[in-house]
From Swiss-Prot:
Protein name per the record: CDP-diacylglycerol pyrophosphatase
GO molecular function: CDP-diacylglycerol diphosphatase activity
Catalytic activity: a CDP-1,2-diacyl-sn-glycerol + H2O = a 1,2-diacyl-sn-glycero-3-phosphate + CMP + 2 H(+)
Topological type in the membrane: Single-pass membrane protein
Species this chain originates from: Escherichia coli (strain ATCC 8739 / DSM 1576 / NBRC 3972 / NCIMB 8545 / WDCM 00012 / Crooks)
Transmembrane annotation, as ranges: 4-24
Gene Ontology biological process terms in this record: CDP-diacylglycerol catabolic process; phospholipid biosynthetic process
Keyword tags: Cell inner membrane, Cell membrane, Hydrolase, Lipid biosynthesis, Lipid metabolism, Membrane, Phospholipid biosynthesis, Phospholipid metabolism, Transmembrane, Transmembrane helix
Family annotation (InterPro entries): CDP-diacylglyc_Pase, CDP-diacylglyc_Pase_proteobac, HIT-like_sf
Chief location of this protein within or outside the cell: membrane
Length: 251
């Protein structure tokens, strides 16, 4: 019993330390790198010179930019042209806020252009990390390849994913996930952030603790994936864990 209690105490200490490290990362100057690129470089260059550089695309009227990430050959980031920190922002559950997940899905074409040939939709994934699972304090959705093992697991669970948020059998990457099937028409009309906040009990009050991902299924529907921070299981809710920025799935 004493050993079990000691082990539990050690796990708590590790979890607290991990959370502290995550917080320390977010309070450093480097955590504003993406925001500075968007607000001080991409946006002014587009407005003054009609040149989105260093971004790949700047859409001021639509409220977003697309930037090639340095990590991986095909990874891009979709970010707002104004200040939104991350999943904890109440702006994301405001219907007047742009539907960033839908916009990010449209931006997957940048992967194909970079690759030199079409990247199949089944190979693409979108992900945003929770407040403790990210290293940057500017909202950004990762547009990148999906891990082959995650792709296989989602294919195998196609029949088990419904239009309600339910636990995904077996979870993903050792962490628990909720999964919800959505049609393209649903996705166009409603942001996944609003779906999560309105449909999962108590999610609205804890949006910053969630990471969210989206993948297309073989029946042309989409699956939304949500994981919530759980420091006791060392889950920082970094939904980016389902992605493979080296794109092995294309080889």
């Amino acid at each position: 019993m004493k050993k079990a209690g000691l082990l539990f105490l050690v796990m708590i200490v590790i979890a607290v330390v991990a959370a502290g490290i995550g917080y320390w990362k977010l309070t450093g100057e480097e955590s504003d790198t993406l925001r500075k690129i968007v607000l001080e470089e991409c946006l002014p260059n587009q407005q003054q010179n009609q040149n989105p550089s260093p971004c790949a695309e700047v859409k001021p009227n639509a409220g977003y930019v697309v930037l090639k990430d340095l990590n991986g050959p095909l990874q891009y980031l979709l970010m707002p042209t104004y200040r939104i920190n991350g999943t904890e922002s109440p702006l994301l559950t405001d219907p007047s806020t742009p539907n960033f997940f839908w916009l990010a899905w449209q931006a997957r074409d940048f992967m194909s252009k970079k690759y030199g040939q079409p990247v199949p939709d089944r190979a693409v994934s979108l992900a945003i990390n929770s407040r403790t699972g990210r290293t940057q304090n500017h909202f950004h959705i990762h547009i990148s390849c999906i891990r082959p093992d995650v792709r296989e697991q989602l294919d195998n669970n196609l029949a088990n994913i419904s239009s309600r948020w339910l636990p995904l059998p077996g979870g993903l990457r050792g962490h628990e996930y909720l999964a919800r099937r959505v049609t393209e028409s649903e996705l166009v009309q409603r942001s996944p952030f609003i779906m999560l906040a309105e449909e999962v009990p108590e999610a609205r009050e804890h949006m910053g603790s969630y990471g969210l991902a989206m993948v297309r299924q073989s029946d042309n529907s989409f699956v939304l994936l949500a994981t919530q921070r759980n420091l006791l299981t060392l889950n920082r809710a970094s939904a980016e864990e389902i992605q493979d920025h080296q794109c092995e799935i294309l080889r």
